[in-house]
Amino acid sequence: MSPHIDANGVPIDCLSFTVRSTWGHFKRVGRSVTKQTYRIPPRTTVAGMLAAIVGADRDSYYDVFGADNSAIAITPLSDLRTVNIPTTGLGTDPKQDVTETAGSWRTYKLTYQNTTGDRQLHSYEVLADPAYRIDVALENEEFYDSLREHLVNGTSIYPPSLGKSEYLAVIEDVEVDREPEVQDIDETLDIDSVVPISLSEAVPQGKVTYGVERSPAVMVRESGGRRTTRFDDYVYAQQASNPVRIGEQTDVAPVQVGDRTVVFR
């Protein structure tokens, strides 16, 4: 049975698992020359990864991860460290020079692109050894049951990855039927997950560096593709051992999941 999600975005129970990889890259929206990465996987990226696990068709699962019928919390488990990796790109413009082989009724005609030129060197900013704890709840019972079965059995229809298909991910420490317990904010509260607030709402701490991002959160299907309908602003701590501290005036609903305090969004 799928969990109910209340008006504050808190589910009655959820699935929890850890996802990690050697590398990760979540391309920032609006960047073209340098391939910069988000430090935290966007909510839409997590949705795509879970859809790959259950084998959902492209553009078919956006309603499952809507703003009101899904809840996701993301907790960094590793320090958010990046490196730049140069890669050589090869253009695919069909107007570029090509070479054709001779063909006849018994043979195929093959077309080869002239690869002696039109190469570009791109620098990819990638996360090194990223690891995240994901808590997820979905009201779509069929999808949720299939996801739970795959996670528990360690199977997937398509291999999960962290951003790029070559950055294959490992999923471990799966827990089911986790019941979040609502936490009261007594002056301040430390949150382990990323928190959907502005930087001005985070309480400063000595020797703790906060980061902020704005990334796609919810998408809808449209003819010929998809469209982002919501972006999330959130705060995270650069070091995995440090929490984000919030005050009692902060408009979020923190919950306890195991030994972690998280905020669903």
From Swiss-Prot:
One of the GO biological process terms: maintenance of CRISPR repeat elements
Pfam families attached to this UniProt entry: Cas_Cas5d
GO CC terms in record: cytoplasm
Disruption phenotype: Loss of the 8 Cas genes in this locus (cas1, cas2, cas3, cas4, cas5, cas6, cas7 and cas8b) leads to loss of CRISPR interference against plasmid targeted by this CRISPR locus, i.e. plasmid is not destroyed by CRISPR.
The keyword S-adenosyl-L-methionine is annotated on this UniProt entry: no
The entry's keywords: Antiviral defense, Cytoplasm, Plasmid
Recorded superkingdom: Archaea
Subcellular location: Cytoplasm
Function: CRISPR (clustered regularly interspaced short palindromic repeat) is an adaptive immune system that provides protection against mobile genetic elements (viruses, transposable elements and conjugative plasmids). CRISPR clusters contain sequences complementary to antecedent mobile elements and target invading nucleic acids. CRISPR clusters are transcribed and processed into CRISPR RNA (crRNA). Plasmid targeted by CRISPR locus P1 transform wild-type cells very poorly.
Other notes: There are 3 CRISPR RNA loci in this organism and a single cas gene locus. A CRISPR-Cas type I-B system.
Quaternary data: Component of the Cascade-like complex (Cascade I-B), composed of Cas5, Cas6, Cas7 and crRNA.
Xref: NCBIfam families: cas_Cas5h (TIGR02592), CRISPR_cas5 (TIGR02593)
Protein name: CRISPR-associated protein Cas5
Organism, scientific name: Haloferax volcanii (strain ATCC 29605 / DSM 3757 / JCM 8879 / NBRC 14742 / NCIMB 2012 / VKM B-1768 / DS2)
Recorded name of the encoding gene: cas5
